[in-house]
Amino acid sequence: MRASRTLRLLLVLPLLLLAACTAGPDDEGDDEPHRWPELAPGQRWQPPPGTGWQWQLTGKLDTSVKAPVYDVDGFNTTKEQVAVLKKAGRKTICYLSTGAWEDFRPDAEAFPQDLLGKGNGWEGERWLDIRRVAELEPLMAKRFDMCREKGFDAVEPDNMDGYQNTSGFPLTAADQLRYNRLIAKLAHDRGMAVGLKNDLDQIPQLVGDFDFAVNEQCAQYDECDRLAPFIEAGKAVFHAEYELSTSRFCVKSRAAKLSSIQKRYDLDAWRRTCP
């Protein structure tokens, strides 16, 4: 759930939203957009290992960053912005929190109170009782419908490891597997790819259900080798580090075929790519 920290900065560090939202001089821009292969009817996008990406969840969206894939906030990004990115040859990923409730989302009141557990460490966010799939599935389906209607190619579902946290519910690994597979199905049923966010322990069981992985700080915590099943399956691992400079992870990242960038914790437009 490391990524959920970044959205809280919308409230605790509002001045960040007033900062300049360009890629900045540290973005080498070596990931030029390219022509993607045409998809056959019923075929969904499958990013290969080493695909470059941009990850921006806060601030005014900067569509000038030279990356073939943009991972952006599903609620705050408009259909028109998605269209601009796709016209420029970019693939787009819709960020959603599927394992935790956020009080700042427009559909927050649709979630019954007894679905909400303990806070996940960030103001306004609480773990969801993912065992209650009969109630959660229609709520999440509406969010995935939104992503599809806006034209997104894929979904990044966040907070996919509640069973490993103090959620307020007796969640098990089996509960998490069931829920994560449901989330993957919701995306696939709508023709979108889907990424497994963190949840390293369940990669062996879930690599076949997901089309790519999204990981934070595997280099800092010496965990990147655990993402190898995705690479071996021909699936991209979109990886970000916050506290390490590129000189400390890029050599190993390139050798492992990870799609690695350095980001700030607020996940604004700034990034630094591997040279």
Describe each model-derived feature in a short phrase.
Residues 29-275:
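Glycan-processing catalytic domains of CAZymes
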Residues 9-14, 27-30:
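Compositionally biased low-complexity segments, especially N-terminal hydrophobic helices
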Residues 22-25:
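Bacterial signal peptide processing site
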Residues 1-10:
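Bacterial N-terminal signal peptides that target proteins for export
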Residues 17-20:
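C-terminal motif of bacterial Sec signal peptides marking the signal peptidase cleavage site
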Residues 14-15, 267:
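Residue-level signal for mature regions of secreted extracellular proteins and peptides
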